[in-house]
UniProtKB/Swiss-Prot annotation:
Biased composition (Basic and acidic residues): 1-14, 68-80
GO cellular component labels: host cell; host cell cytoplasm
Quaternary state and interactors: Monomer. Interacts with hexon protein; this interaction allows chaperoning and trimerization of hexon proteins. Interacts (via N-terminus) with host initiation factor EIF4G (via C-terminus). Interacts (via RRM domain) with viral mRNAs that contain the tripartite leader; this interaction allows ribosome shunting and expression of viral late mRNAs.
Full protein name: Shutoff protein
An example Gene Ontology biological process: symbiont-mediated suppression of host gene expression
Alphabetized GO MF terms: RNA binding
Species name: Fowl adenovirus C serotype 10 (strain SA2) (FAdV-10)
Free-text description of this protein's post-translational modifications in UniProt: Might be cleaved by the viral protease.
Amino acid sequence: MESTADGDKARGEEPVAEGEASDIRRGDGEFPAPEDEHPDDGEPDEPADRDDRSGESDADSGYYSADGGRDAECDGEAARPDTPTDESSAPTTPSTAVRRSSGESSPDRGGCFSHSSDSELGCATETRDPFAAGLRKCIERQAMILTGALKDAHVDPPLDSMPLTVDAVQRQLERFLFNPDPKVPREHVELATTFMPPFMTPKAIANYHIFCGNRPIPPSCKANRSGSEVLRAAENARFFKRLPRWKQGVTVDDGLGDEVSPITELKDAKLVPLRDDTSRLEWAKMRGEHVRYFCYPSLHMPPKISRMLMEVLLQPFAQEVASGPDQEDPEPVYPTAELACIVDPEGVMQPHGLARAIEVDGHGSAGRPLYRSARAYGSVFREPSSIKKAQEVLHHTFHHGFVALIRETAKVNLSNYATFHGITYNDPLNNCMLAKLMEGSDKRDYVVDSIYLFLVLTWQTAMGMWQQAIQEETIEAYREAFTRLRRAIYALETPTEISKAIVDVLMDGDRLCAEMPKLPNFTNGSQISAFRQFIMERSNIPTTAAPFLPSDFVPLSFRQAQPLLWDQVYLLQTAFFLCNHGGYLWEPEETENPNPRDRTYCPCNLCSPHRMPQHNVPLHNELLAINTFEIRTDDGKTFKLTPELWANAYLDKFEPKDYHPFEVVHFPQHEEAFSRDLTACVTKSPEILSLIRQIQASREEFLLTRGKGVYKDPDTGEVLTPQPDLQAGAARRQALPTAYADHARGAATSAEPSRALRPTSVATAAGNRTRGCSSARYRLGPTLRRRSNSSWPREWST
């Protein structure tokens, strides 16, 4: 509440400005109330201008609608004892509020005159009305937005050449608020015009509309396979296996099995506590005894494609058949008699064998849609270019390997960027270090689950693009093609051949695979975490109480899963392979003095050996030469090796012949499998770096021996130039050199390994962005140091 100027003078205080008056209250926090309205009942005093409805949020928010707040409510209030009976009882209007802001004395809504006072704060108006300040703020905000909209007017025709109408201003205002100028960077957009509710999950736009489907959790899921052989085989996956062939007569057992040892009776629980459960699973199963169903993310074909295939290859939908009192269910596309002719065209099979063949073909027709989707995954994700792109994206997601080295060198965190439909977004709120905060089984489960969700999100994005881009003409062309090939498809012997034929027609050979290099999108860790939370919420599993992961409910083997979950099984197996192939679980050996370079090391084919300075000596030398030289040609052009130039060339560095997409071949264990020469990124010739080092060494030697002045080491303050003896009468001679060994500075080399330059904990690695592989004593640059007989560190001569 605000205090009047007279009240301030009565207490011996100076009148305050309108903006400050709202913060000045009595000792009890409010103005005194008349005795006839508020008797002394022991309750806190209420403000005089507050009615029974004053608990609304508008009373404290400082924001009101354009009509000035609650005018209708205030105008109908009864006259208070302190309300004058003169013209001051007139209600507040926008015009009176404007007059107050200009310095005129006008009555407020409550009926008290505002007293003008020429205080040293420059306050021109004082008011007791709590709504006047809010109304003024509202008008100022609306005027600011409208002014920005008019300045940003780029309508056709221009706004200044057309009549200034309400419709024209409204259109420009909507354009200014909801369609900002794309030339303005997103990080510089005015925050006052951003209306997305904080932390709200946006509705999926331009994406697959079927998100997930509820199904019973099989007892053979990954959460019930702790300590089993099938889980160990999945964790040690070394090859990207093909989709198995569908054989008739294979039995599927999705029960708990004999491989695991439960510690309680089975009862009706879907998630059984086991002896080999991790601490996370023990706690989750104890709190998740009620879980029976899970919301598995959808991995089907686009709805338009699936509907067309069902109508052409199986039978039409019932609602599309003309309805009537005697109308029967739609017939299959091939009745039993015609199907018998397709299965046995020569008529040589016995009746029993023919019936069996028809039954088998019918079962194949039922399972073909599920097997067909998995077949499509195999044809897309097993492409070498798709594997390479997926590993690059996952390195960005986990801030691993070459992405971490770029951050150390160029001070750019690429893990914060995400792409979608050709648009790049920067998310500075992303946390890319979550996977590095865990270890052991917790880290493995988290990384595998993140890769599994990444594959699901990638497939749903591709199917969403296909669903939106496909036209009715294309659907009709598909319908004609499958109608023409329907008999030949049914004549195939195995479901594997049938599914392959259908996928080949749908994908037009490798047409979809040709489009997949645009996918997957770069995905950051916050997107994966939000997707994980979304799936768990849809499954009614609070992660704060039961810390399950979506991949915990997926079986590990096709033989232990019903056909409805085969697509989930395939993606989970792919996630295990990509986890091992990308080296995301690599940990350095624990030593007393950790190597700072281990923060950015990765053993996978994308990084080692060509992108890792630990293995690539020319790359290591080039890292040390960044920002240390500048070459100027005769025509005035200059060349300088900057971090940005190096980072761009480093991202493009890739050797296809040393890349093994379908097998886990890490360089430290299989050096013989890599044959390409190790080179730098920008300076391909090592002679250039050698010449630069010689020039730099000569320059430093010249300045140290013949230059004037005293040169000190910038790190230790140690004097580098020889100092003459200043005693009187002493003969001038060269000063004794400081105790240098084969290092650039410091005492003699100790037999113990050198300690880390900086703390190497994960938190320090995230906060201190030091340049990778660039110790201060090995840096080239304007800092001058005296060197030993060996002008350069030993690392360069190896």
